[in-house]
Amino acid sequence: MSRNKKLRLLVTTKCPHHCPLCCNNSWNFDELPRVNRWNYQQIMITGGEPLIHPIKVQLLTETIRSITDMQGTNPEIFLYTSICDSRLDRILDSVNGIVLTPHNKDDVERFLKTNSRFLEMKGVGYWHTISLRLNLFKDIKEMLPEGVDLSLWKVKDMEWIKDCPVPEGEDFRRIENLW
């Protein structure tokens, strides 16, 4: 039996949004298996909203890097978040990429400021190595100004999926003690 190569790692169920169709509404997290291995090609840190706890996210990524270094593996680490402020800046040098999903008008306004700043820093430092992914639901996409430069981002149009099945080839696990 082959092992899955991607891990969706739940670190918290806390979230500032209360989306009626949120994937988390369809899971019993007490029954979700605990992570028991780290030899994945990709680890996706998710929640709830992980960046409610930016220091813990940073410590977790450092711990994962230490463990996988000893194992001789080097997984890509992605952070799934809706937060687009200084907390995001704090974690950027600890991950291979972010997957940002703005949820409301305030998120869009913060994203536009961050995007402008990122565009100014394009080509400086580690920016060429970071994967920037932007998930946009239709109503959020319509809030973006016409002609906004999204060239740094891999943009994915999103829609709510009932019951949110785990994609094939992925494990969905949680840390032992959720934040």
Where are these regions (language model features)?
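Charged helix-capping and loop-helix junction motifs
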Residues: L59-E62, K113-T114
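Positively charged, amphipathic N-terminal segments that serve as targeting/anchoring signals
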Residues: K14, S66-I67
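Auxiliary Fe-S-binding modules of radical SAM enzymes
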Residues: K122-W179
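Core AdoMet radical
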Residues: C23-F29, N39-H53, I67-R87, S94-T114, ...
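Glycine-enriched alpha-helix->loop->beta-strand junction motifs that scaffold or abut catalytic
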Residues: L92-V99, E146-L150
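Metal-dependent catalytic neighborhoods of phosphoester/phosphodiester hydrolases
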Residues: P54-Q58
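Canonical Radical SAM [4Fe-4S] cluster-binding loop centered on the CxxxCxxC motif
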Residues: M1-L32, W38
